Amino acid sequence: MDQLTSAARLMIVSDLDHTMVDHHDAENLSLLRFNALWEANYRDNSLLVFSTGRSPTLYKELRKEKPMLTPDITIMSVGTEITYGNSVVPDDGWEAFLNNKWDRKIVTEETSKFPELTLQSETEQRPHKVSFYVQKDKAQDIMKTLSKRFEERGLDVKIIYSGGMDLDILPQGAGKGQALAYLLKKLKSEGKLPNNTLACGDSGNDAELFSIPDVYGVMVANAQEELLQWHAANAKNNPKVIHATERCAAGIIQAIGHSNLGPSTSPRDVMDLSDCKMENFVPAYEVVKFYLFFEKWRRGEIEHSEHYLSNLKAVCRPSGTFVHPSGVEKSLQECVTLFGTCHGDKQGKQFRIWVDQVLPVQVGSDSWLVSFKKWELSGEDRRCCITTVLLSSKNKTVADGLTWTHVHQTWLNGAAASDSASWFF
């Protein structure tokens, strides 16, 4: 978020479970498609916001399980916690706002009178959120009775039922919708109101997102009945809110294209990456394309062709260097030769590569320094290195004028590969 000096081109605010993340997609293909689209076209001028019912603990667990990007802003615990950036800096102003007419002690006291309510795990109990499980046929009556009792005791709370079993009690001012409204107001006060905002969800606790004025919305194809019913009753005449025909992250990509919010073709959907050209030199796009080619080569999804290797050598400066995360320095040309020998070595295996937080900085008239995290997943093994690449856009020997001059990598703490010899570029 701090890298933006002006209004974001697009702000995507997305739920995670069953929206951005498809738990029925073992290969995580729709998520990886979104990742490539975002990093290639949006990362340096837009904002990615994850809005989840998960607590910080469960959110961190999900990040370890799935190939997720790093968001600029994270809204957790059903809109009761807002944090910023890698350091997860909390928004103290939001926390203070939520204290109005909220008393957690009274909430726990009143809910303890209902044996039908089962407390969720301790990690899900937060300063401004008390969470339970409840059977679907009991939910509405309990919510009605609790609302009356809280009002009698001077509290102003909100009760949200979602997922057919989750019941969350929050301050009235909390929730995913209010958290989004707060963010938009804050960004506007800073002169950075996004040009467009797209809200994405699948369940009842996402409904509020679609109530914010001037916000585009997408209910993914697998949206739950509770959200569809809410939409039919409250937003069916809003042309900005659509019900996608694609599941999860694929539905988000579909919504970007449907509403003309920006590029909506993921580099992962391009069959021949060598023919994938941009009108102008876009460093982030080139980085994403390069590592996608690397993945496809090792998975044996493209043919073993000298044509591809020749093109790869052409974009690597003859005197260019690669500093391996282990500290060993090699020539880029030598790396291409080694790369050529590993064609199809991951065929039939779970092997994926994605890049995160691709941020280019122009350091000369035709030179760019691009920093990012490069992730590799091989079976159950996940490895990551912090990567810096020096690119030049002045190369008359190749069609798009691109030259890779220098690549430097260091292992991310706790994410080093046990077999460094198998780590390329």
Swiss-Prot record:
Pfam family, one: S6PP_C
Catalysed reaction equations from the record: sucrose 6(F)-phosphate + H2O = sucrose + phosphate
PANTHER family, per database record: SUCROSE-PHOSPHATASE 2 (PTHR46521:SF9), SUCROSE-PHOSPHATASE 2-RELATED (PTHR46521)
Described function: Catalyzes the final step of sucrose synthesis.
Protein name: Sucrose-phosphatase 2
Required cofactor names: Mg(2+)
Metabolic or biological pathway, per its Swiss-Prot or TrEMBL entry: Glycan biosynthesis; sucrose biosynthesis; sucrose from D-fructose 6-phosphate and UDP-alpha-D-glucose: step 2/2
